[in-house]
């Protein structure tokens, strides 16, 4: 971006100056509205989420047999919800900032099959595509026991088709493993940030991995191009896919059930704050949409991004969405949080969700490493750096009197708050890699 343009952008949006300086930045969204007002802009409804829920239930018998690790839950891919009181104390001590209410962790980091939040959206979109093909071919009806998809006949049928996706790692892992298990030929286009172990794991499942020297945007573009030349190839578009988004959104109702099971109340007097790491935006956007449908205006969602990849904060704050990238303002998009190394946000998610998100913030790689170490020490839970992005949220919210006043929170409400950090990945990180992460914390 030429200087004059840059100066006028900063004059209009002074916060951009802090982003350019790679400062840890927090922006509370003044444009937040009620669910009733914001919902029409999403372009999807509660019915769409129910359909996704039903589809996952139809596939449950198949998943229970296809992946032994899902047998115990009857083929439902869901993660634990745990309180992390020792981590809460540690954060308060390290940051000299009390966190009112209770701190919880949602362990999508340990979801079965692929060990990340992408096991929600990625697997769902592969299943939705497989179902569509099998129904159209007359090989399947909605009332069938879907475990029949494991038969050689179906493997043979699906092998005529291929799937392609561009990824920084975790989405590729989910889509690659699932597609290969069903019988699709699958190619994952991996950006420069992708970890070597993720590529190796994919190849061990018979997935074709194409590696790029460039970032996420290039990997997605190349994947899209390669798929266009083959009519039997389906490209899963992380930037714009409504199907992926709906796969994530099912988490809302599931979390509501977990809260009920644990006797946790969410209402006007007991607000829920949820902190979601954000890359291109599909995962956190879909989850936030599902949470809003489940808890209405009593849930407040925040997106967390690396200081080197603040694409969603930049896009929503300036209103430019996918028309601007972090590279345009001189930021390099290089971060240890490989799952969040995205320079240009999803235009679909930003525009759909901007009225339903309470805020956005950035944090440095070092902050993620520090918190990664503290969580391992205090709670014995090991995550990858990206998954710690949400952990900085509770301090930011509790420290901001202006945000609390903007929403009219009383001291009583804040005392009754639940802070939920969404841990997005790390359950499958190899030991030696994890030890390198732990060594970087202070």
UniProtKB/Swiss-Prot annotation:
GO terms for molecular function: D-serine ammonia-lyase activity; hydro-lyase activity; pyridoxal phosphate binding. CDD domains: D-Ser-dehyd (cd06447). Keywords: Lyase, Pyridoxal phosphate. It comes from the Bacteria. Pfam families: PALP. The keyword Lyase applies. The keyword Lyase applies. Its EC number is 4.3.1.18. GO terms for biological process: D-serine catabolic process; isoleucine biosynthetic process. It catalyses: D-serine = pyruvate + NH4(+). Its cofactor is pyridoxal 5'-phosphate. The modification N6-(pyridoxal phosphate)lysine is found at residue 118. Monomer. Belongs to the serine/threonine dehydratase family. DsdA subfamily. This is D-serine dehydratase. It comes from Shigella sonnei (strain Ss046).
């Amino acid at each position: 971006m030429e200087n004059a343009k840059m100066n006028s952008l900063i004059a209009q949006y002074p916060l951009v100056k802090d982003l350019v300086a790679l400062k840890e930045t927090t922006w509370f969204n003044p444009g937040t509205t009620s669910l009733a007002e914001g919902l029409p802009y999403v372009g999807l409804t509660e019915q769409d989420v129910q359909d996704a829920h039903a589809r996952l239930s139809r596939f449950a018998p198949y998943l229970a047999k296809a992946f032994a690790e899902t047998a115990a839950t009857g083929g439902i891919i869901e993660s634990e919800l745990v309180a992390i009181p020792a981590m809460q104390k540690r954060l308060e001590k390290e940051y000299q900032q009390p966190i009112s209410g209770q701190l919880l962790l949602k362990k999508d980091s340990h979801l079965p099959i692929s060990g990340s939040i992408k096991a929600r959206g990625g697997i769902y979109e592969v299943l939705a595509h497989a179902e569509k093909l099998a129904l159209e071919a007359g090989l399947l009806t909605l009332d069938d026991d879907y475990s029949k998809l494991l038969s050689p006949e179906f493997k043979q049928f699906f092998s005529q088709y291929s799937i392609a996706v561009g990824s920084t790692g975790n989405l590729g892992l989910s889509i690659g493993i699932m597609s290969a298990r069903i019988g699709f030929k699958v190619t994952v286009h991996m950006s420069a940030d992708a970890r070597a172990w993720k590529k190796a794991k994919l190849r061990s499942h018979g997935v074709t991995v194409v590696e790029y020297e460039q970032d996420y945007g290039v990997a997605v573009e190349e994947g899209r191009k390669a798929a266009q030349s083959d009519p039997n190839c389906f490209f899963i578009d992380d930037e714009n896919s409504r199907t992926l988004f709906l796969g994530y959104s099912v988490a809302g109702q599931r979390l509501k059930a977990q809260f009920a099971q644990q006797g946790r109340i969410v209402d006007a007097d007991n607000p829920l704050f949820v902190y979601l790491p954000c890359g291109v935006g599909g995962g956190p956007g879909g989850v936030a949409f599902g949470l809003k449908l489940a808890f209405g205006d009593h849930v407040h969602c925040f997106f967390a991004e690396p200081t080197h990849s603040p694409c969603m904060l930049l896009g929503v704050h300036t209103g430019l969405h996918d028309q601007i990238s972090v590279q345009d303002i001189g930021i390099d998009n290089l971060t240890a949080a490989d799952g969040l190394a995205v320079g240009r946000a999803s235009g679909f998610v930003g525009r759909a969700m901007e009225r339903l998100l309470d805020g956005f913030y950035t944090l440095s790689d070092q902050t993620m490493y520090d918190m990664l170490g503290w969580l391992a020490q205090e709670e014995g839970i090991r995550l990858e750096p990206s998954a710690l992005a949400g952990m900085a949220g509770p301090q930011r919210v509790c420290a901001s009197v202006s945000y609390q006043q903007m929403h009219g929170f009383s001291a009583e409400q804040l005392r009754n708050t639940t802070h939920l950090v969404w841990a997005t990945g790390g359950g499958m990180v190899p030991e030696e890699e994890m030890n390198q992460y732990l060594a970087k914390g202070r």
